[in-house]
From Swiss-Prot:
GO biological process, one term: L-aspartate transmembrane transport
Major location category of this protein: membrane
Similarity-based family: Belongs to the dicarboxylate/amino acid:cation symporter (DAACS) (TC 2.A.23) family.
Protein name: C4-dicarboxylate transport protein
One Pfam entry name: SDF
Bilayer topology term: Multi-pass membrane protein
UniProt-listed InterPro entries: C4_dicarb_transport (IPR023954), Na-dicarboxylate_symporter (IPR001991), Na-dicarboxylate_symporter_CS (IPR018107), Na:dicarbo_symporter_sf (IPR036458)
Cellular localisation: Cell inner membrane
Length: 429
């Protein structure tokens, strides 16, 4: 097959669009801020099909399972994996902040901080208790779940729908075939919308730089650098070790999903690449049933980047305001963060709202301290989203391997760039 010219390759177009967006935002900020609808429009187009795609993928995956116990087994393994890896992410955030101490030297007096700017985030955080979160998973109506684009609600409906179809067997085959065909149509729509990714990335990046300016990063550059460095270490060391044990290379995996990562980088939304990620994972040898269960669930329960950010941000505020936290308080912070981070993707301004919820349970640190990082949160959200999407991709491959539903030949071929492979199963990639 003839190779595409480099300028027609999607990730090259996205990189170029991001660079142009940065230039426009820096030199013509007023014009750049007007580009925001381009980024918002692209994300809305993607979100338009996320709900139906998750529903169809999960339903066809479960309907194709002969043993319904398998659904519970896959879900249980996924949740166990999420909890263990999330704990590593939280601990790494704490450790990195202790070692690099990005907040030391600020000497901020908490009494001088104006908490009005974060009041709305704090209010939302207080309004989301554990019981509220669990009840929120149950939609008022099936239509309402799709209309609001609530991933966990759609996942619940899909689990019930798929379970019934699996129970019906041949009698439900007509419905299963219809949903399978609908899945193909929806992914076709995604392919069309994805071609607009450079425009969306340009608009989102131009707005960010135009509104906040590169100069606004300088005073808090140490925190941003610490967060990005810690996230890279997490991906290469923690996820890299998990990947190596499972039998593939994290570097090759990241390279395989580079188009999805660039879309996330440009839009600062991990949801913008969810449909493409699911399709890529299936092509890489993960079974549809595992992809359908693990990826959507991971978007609420496996937010590795958000976990690193939360413990790091809390400790940064403590350091900046010269507040010493005891080890017991830090263990409390860790335990609270493990709970507040779950379901964060279902809330607007997720990272900041979860941070407010965590701080509310550690009264030693003033909630008004969030003002210190409010201005740079937008610049850190890209790294959160990138780490989250890599983490969910790795989780899906790992759970597929645990279930012995990972086609290693397909995985090896995909990560090698689509070259020919032997039919014998590879020991590693």
């Amino acid at each position: 097959m003839k190779k595409k010219p480099f300028y027609k390759v999607l990730y090259v177009q996205v990189i170029f669009a991001i660079i142009v967006g940065v230039i426009l935002g820096h030199f013509y900020p007023a014009l750049a801020t007007d580009m925001k609808p381009l980024g918002d429009g692209f994300i809305k187009l993607i979100k338009m099909v996320i709900g139906p795609i998750i529903f169809c993928t999960v339903v066809t995956g479960i309907a194709g399972m002969e043993d319904m116990k398998k659904v519970g087994r896959v879900g249980g393994k996924a949740l166990l994996y999420f909890e263990v890896v999330s704990t590593f992410a939280l601990l790494l955030g704490l450790a990195a902040t202790h070692i690099l101490r990005p907040g030391v030297g600020f000497n901020i007096d908490p009494a001088t901080l104006d908490g009005k700017a974060v009041a709305s985030y704090a209010a939302k955080a207080h309004g989301q208790s554990t019981v509220d979160f669990l009840l929120h998973i149950i939609p008022n109506t099936m239509v309402d779940a799709f209309a609001q684009g609530e991933i966990l609600q759609i996942l619940l409906i899909a689990l019930l729908f798929g379970s019934v179809l699996a129970h019906l067997g041949e009698r439900g085959k007509v419905v299963t075939d219809f949903i399978d065909g609908l899945t193909r149509v929806l992914f076709g729509i995604v392919h069309i919308v994805t071609k607009l990714a450079p425009i969306g990335a340009f608009g989102a990046m131009a707005f960010t730089i135009g509104k906040y300016g590169v100069g606004s990063l300088v005073p808090l550059l140490k925190l941003i650098g610490t967060f990005y460095l810690t996230s890279i270490v997490f991906v290469l060391v923690v996820l890299g070790t998990i990947a190596r044990v499972t039998g593939f290379s994290i570097i090759r995996f990241v390279s395989y999903i580079k188009e999805e990562l660039l879309i996330v980088l440009g839009t600062s939304s991990s949801e913008a690449a969810l449909p493409q990620l699911m399709e890529k994972l299936e092509k890489a040898g993960c079974s549809r049933s595992v992809v359908g269960l693990v990826v959507p669930t991971g978007y609420s329960f496996n937010l590795d980047g958000t976990n690193i950010y939360m413990t790091m941000a809390v400790l940064f505020i403590a350091q900046a305001t010269n507040i010493e936290l005891t080890w017991m308080q830090q263990l409390t912070l860790l335990a609270v963060a493990m709970l507040t981070s779950k379901g964060a993707s279902g809330v607007t301004g997720a990272g900041f709202i979860t941070l407010a919820a965590t701080l509310a349970v550690v009264p030693t640190i003033p909630l008004s301290g969030m003002v210190l990082i409010l201005g740079i949160d937008r610049f850190m959200s890209e790294c959160r989203a990138l780490t989250n999407i890599v983490g969910n991709g790795v989780a899906t491959v790992v759970v597929s391997a645990w279930e012995k539903e990972l086609d290693r030949n397909k995985l090896r071929q995909a990560l090698a760039g689509g070259g020919e492979v032997k039919t014998t199963e590879a020991a590693g990639v």
